[in-house]
Each structure stands twice: as C-alpha cells, then as structure tokens.
C-alpha cells in the first residue's frame, strides 16, 4: 500500500502543546467501525459506552526521565542521549545527538561526572550502545539528571512530570507515554469498576518505534522496532473469562493492542501469559484476533499508529473521522483528545 493513502492535512495549531488542567475533560470522538458514524463527546462520557462485563486493558508501563544532556570528556562537546531499552547489565540502546561525534570508546559525562557512559557499539537505525557507570542507584540518578522525553512536536516545557504518566503507571521502562491512558483519573476508573467494567493490566515498554517515521513509500517495506511486552497468566485468564461471558475486550492505546494481538498471533488466536519482544505491524488487511474496541489518541499523518487504527476501523472511516476532527478543532497527538472505536459504538446503556 502507498504511504500517501494515510496522509491528511493537519494545521500545526491543532497539535496540543500542554495537557489540559483536568485529564478527563479532553474531548472524545466515538467512531462506529462498522458504519463510520461519529459522535462528539467528552472523555468522561466513556462511562456511557462501556458495559457491565466489558474489560479495559491498560498498559502500566512507566516513562523514564530518559533524555540526558552530557558532554564528551575529551572535547567538552554537548551530547544529547535518549535511553531506549536496557540490554545486559548497565548497557542501554540509545539515540544520541549528534551521532557522528559518538564513536566506540567515546566517554560522555553527565551531571559533572555523577553519571558516565562509554560507547561500546552501534545499534539499529543509527543508535548507540552505551555502558553506564555510577555510584548509587541508577534510576535515582536518572530521576535527578534526566528529563521527560517529550516527542519532538511538543515545544513547550512540561511543568509537572506526572502529567506525562498515567495514574496507574507502575513498571518503569518506557521512552514515551502510552498516551491514550493519560485521560483516565483514579475516580473515573473507580466509576467504571462500580459499573461492572473490569480492568486488566499489561506492560509494553514504548521504545524506538514511537520516534521513527515510516521512510518507505510502500508500507509493507517498513520494519517496526521491537518492544518488550509482558502479560501474566492471571490477566490472560481474566480476558478469556470476559470473552466466554460475552463481554468486550477494549484496549487502551495502540501499545495494549499490539501486546494482545502479538500474543494471539503467536498462540493460534488464544490469549495466555507471555513475555517477549514484539515488532508486529498492523495495517489494513490485518485480521484482529483479540480485541473488540480501542481507545486511542489522534495520530500523526502517515504514521504506523494511524495505519493500526485504519486496520481496525477501515481506512476510509478513519480518514473521514480525522478530517472531521480537524474541522471540529480536536487537539492532536500526545496531549490531545481521544477516540473510542468499536462495532455498534453508539449503542449506549440506557
């Protein structure tokens, strides 16, 4: 498929630069994946669209303050490092800028030597393997020296780090937030549970794929960067029980979707406890095996994320919805508004 089939016009002023004061006050577009019908709501209205017996699947990964600013020990030149994933011990796959200045053996110092990194090799797609040395606890030092790795299209400074974390973030390891979950408050999750909606938690650590645009004209030629996922057998049992009893599995975000679909693809359509690395790439023609609905933000033109959403709800339906979102001035991307996509999505409980 031609990548231009997933393009749309997006005025720059619709890219949300800061989160709203209250998470649940963002807008919600409800899209029926069968008919293409659209409703305009607020995120707190999601209560009306989820039924007793349904299950929300949430990614409880926690974002690291993964962006570090350091200097080369030999020249004092400024180097920016973005941690992507931990390999063995204190060795990490990273992105560095400017990459041409960081060769094998280069030593980078952060926080006046509180943290040091030595380049021990190259990684996929221009990355670098850095081995860190320090005294103390790595994540405590990272918390002190690091910055939240906001996407490049967000120019504003984030005053409160917690606004780039979900309220249920638990397992540290991501280089970006699973942004669909940013709309939920503890109170809203409690109301959903009181209604009989179940909550299930998985982990997928968001990595390089989030930062890499598709660089091929034919989307089939694009290769996703692998990301680590984990789902417990207890969670799998809960999800299978939901299915048996006629409930819907609603994933919160593309990361939860990729986790469940990876597991179902690798286990003959069944959900079971599993851990591993996924590079699954979903675009129109992909047959979904695990999920019945999806909550997600509005994504970049020509991105793998809009391709995933198009695979689930149909490219024409999705592009029509996106053009409607532009017309209605929805806020886009990480701090933007949300969509709920499902079959018969407009059929709310009376």
From Swiss-Prot:
Catalyzed reaction equations: 7-aminomethyl-7-carbaguanosine(34) in tRNA + S-adenosyl-L-methionine = epoxyqueuosine(34) in tRNA + adenine + L-methionine + 2 H(+)
One cellular component (GO) term of this entry: cytoplasm
EC number from the UniProt entry: 2.4.99.17
Keywords: Cytoplasm, Queuosine biosynthesis, S-adenosyl-L-methionine, Transferase
Cellular localization per UniProt: Cytoplasm
Signal peptide range: none
InterPro entries per UniProt: QueA, QueA_dom1, QueA_dom2, QueA_sf
MF GO annotations: S-adenosylmethionine:tRNA ribosyltransferase-isomerase activity
Pfam families named among the record's database cross-references: Queuosine_synth
Role summary: Transfers and isomerizes the ribose moiety from AdoMet to the 7-aminomethyl group of 7-deazaguanine (preQ1-tRNA) to give epoxyqueuosine (oQ-tRNA).
Similarity annotation: Belongs to the QueA family.
Name recorded for this polypeptide: S-adenosylmethionine:tRNA ribosyltransferase-isomerase
This protein's encoding gene: queA
